[in-house]
């Protein structure tokens, strides 16, 4: 947190430099500039992805790649980075989490990009370990000599404490020469590692690492920017001449554990602010490659002004003939009740969980067990509440009927499903009370994630009598009824 405060202080104090210009452009009234460049064609991208990459290439100050669910945001961002490297020798690529940094780094490595991963190696995934600074340093051709010198220095240090005065003087002289050589080797290794890297990749906080002191970058790319704290973004922006933000501020925001901090504005991200302040910098990716169009359409209408479209090859994808892609199972007449089990785990609705598992088993039976195993048809069970998730996991573990399919069934919270997809998704909304209270189901970004994870079949279980008081859920109910999915 100290690093974030220091970054914010630098931003506030900035005057007459590039950081001040970026601050006034991103958050103030200074106009975002764009170069006049001849558009680059990318036949393997769709038109909105191509437009987004070209906007990144033209931007003098800031560009935003707004990637709704399934629209190929990562593909677009990798292409933008790859193309930028034809114009700049090196870029900085950051994200809030190590997982997100590793994900984009893996995609860049697959494209043949030389990535140098900065950060704690224990938090880096196995595939990216060989690209960490520490591993690259140890694998450098000059490292054996440096290791040998360090070993000799340790041995000489022991002898110096035991020897005579004349011996100690000779040893100290030798140690001084060795230290100078070791320093020269370290500098040479570091220089070669950083000069040869096309991409320096780190979390936003780790961009303040001592190894990056004094280094500047023409372009900073921030992936999953909609989940990044604004203060963390400024840590990295201090090192850059321009910034590219990629993400979706209509999905999950950063995790803020302090309710007062969230209410005070910490939950509102830099990407959200810049998208509102500089709409000319935003490129919306409009073609999605995940969902049947009936699953996609409600999210598109509510969150993205109806601008999303399903790619032709997946527009009518399905598992069963004569099946409805979206189903809402209304539990209003079933007398189900939620239970509060504590602040940590939230609420549970056991009867709704039992019904969900019954519906899951019935759907598996309709598809056919052998087909599910042969085609690896996978299922996701989502609930906003940890207690419901744990209860469902326990019931699945004890179910003999579901045992053959356990490896194909994932149960998690909405947050745990961010960035994932499954062939079939069941959502348990849990809330069922006479007061119409829905708690943090009021956070519609969370629901946007939940209803956009399914490729071919989405089943929602919830009490319409409770949820229907909220305009979002009322319209979702009406939409599902319209596409003939309501039961």
PLM region spans:
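Pre-ATPase regulatory/linker segments immediately N-terminal to the P-loop/RecA-like helicase/translocase core
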Residues: 1-54, 110, 127-155
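N-terminal pre-P-loop "Q-motif" helix
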Residues: 42-61, 76, 202, 348
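Hydrophobic/aromatic ligand-binding patch that stacks against planar heteroaromatic rings
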Residues: 54-55, 83, 107, 234-236, ...
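Walker A/P-loop
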Residues: 60-80, 419
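Conserved beta-strand position immediately N-terminal to the Walker
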Residues: 63-67, 91-92, 379
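The Walker A (P-loop) glycine that initiates the GxxxxGKT/S ATP-binding motif of P-loop NTPases
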Residues: 67, 120, 224
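Alpha-helical nucleic-acid-binding subdomain
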Residues: 78-220, 232, 257, 271-272, ...
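Conserved helicase motor core of SF1/SF2 NTP-dependent helicases
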Residues: 87-89, 97, 191, 205-487
């Amino acid at each position: 947190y100290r690093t974030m405060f220091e970054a914010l202080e630098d931003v506030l104090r900035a005057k007459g430099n590039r950081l001040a210009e970026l601050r006034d452009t991103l958050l103030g009234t200074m106009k975002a500039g764009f170069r006049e460049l001849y558009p680059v064609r990318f036949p393997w991208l769709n038109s909105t992805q191509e437009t987004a990459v070209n906007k990144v290439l033209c931007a003098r100050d800031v560009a935003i790649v707004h990637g709704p669910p399934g629209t190929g945001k990562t593909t677009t961002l990798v292409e933008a980075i790859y193309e930028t490297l034809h114009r700049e020798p090196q870029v900085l690529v950051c994200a809030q989490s190590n997982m997100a940094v590793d994900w984009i780094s893996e995609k860049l490595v697959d494209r043949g990009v030389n990535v140098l991963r900065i950060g704690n190696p224990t938090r880096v995934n196995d595939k990216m370990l060989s690209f960490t600074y520490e591993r690259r340093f140890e694998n450098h051709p000059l490292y054996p000599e440096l290791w040998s010198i360090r070993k000799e220095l340790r041995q000489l240090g022991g002898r110096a404490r035991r020897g005579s005065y004349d011996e100690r003087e000779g040893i100290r002289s030798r140690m001084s020469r060795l230290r100078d050589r070791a320093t020269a080797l370290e500098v040479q290794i570091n220089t070669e590692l950083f000069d040869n890297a096309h991409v320096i990749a780190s979390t936003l906080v780790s961009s303040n690492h001592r190894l990056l002191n004094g280094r500047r970058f023409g372009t900073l790319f921030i992936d999953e920017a909609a989940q990044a704290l604004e203060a963390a973004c400024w840590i990295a922006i201090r090192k850059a001449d321009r910034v590219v933000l990629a993400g979706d501020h209509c999905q999950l925001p950063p995790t803020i554990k302090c309710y007062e901090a969230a209410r005070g504005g910490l939950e509102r991200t830099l990407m959200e602010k810049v998208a509102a302040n500089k709409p000319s910098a935003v490129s919306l990716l409009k073609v999605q490659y995940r969902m049947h169009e009936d699953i996609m359409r409600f999210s598109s209408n509510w969150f993205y002004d109806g601008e999303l479209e399903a790619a032709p090859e997946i527009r009518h994808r399905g598992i069963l003939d004569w099946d409805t892609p979206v189903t809402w199972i209304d539990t209003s007449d079933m007398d189900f009740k939620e239970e509060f089990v504590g602040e940590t785990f939230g609420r549970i609705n056991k009867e709704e969980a039992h019904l969900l598992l019954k519906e899951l088993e019935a759907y598996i039976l309709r598809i056919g067990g052998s087909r599910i195993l042969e085609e690896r048809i996978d299922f996701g069970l989502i609930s906003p509440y940890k207690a419901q998730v744990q209860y469902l996991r326990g019931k699945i573990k004890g179910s003999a009927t579901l045992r053959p399919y356990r490896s194909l069934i994932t149960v998690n919270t909405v947050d745990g499903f961010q960035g994932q997809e499954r062939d079939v998704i069941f959502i348990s909304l849990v809330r069922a009370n006479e007061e119409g209270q829905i708690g943090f189901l009021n956070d519609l970004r969370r629901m946007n994630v939940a209803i956009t994870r399914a490729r071919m079949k989405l089943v929602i279980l919830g009490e319409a009598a409770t949820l229907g008081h909220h305009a979002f859920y009322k319209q979702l109910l009406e939409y599902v009824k319209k596409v003939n999915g309501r039961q």
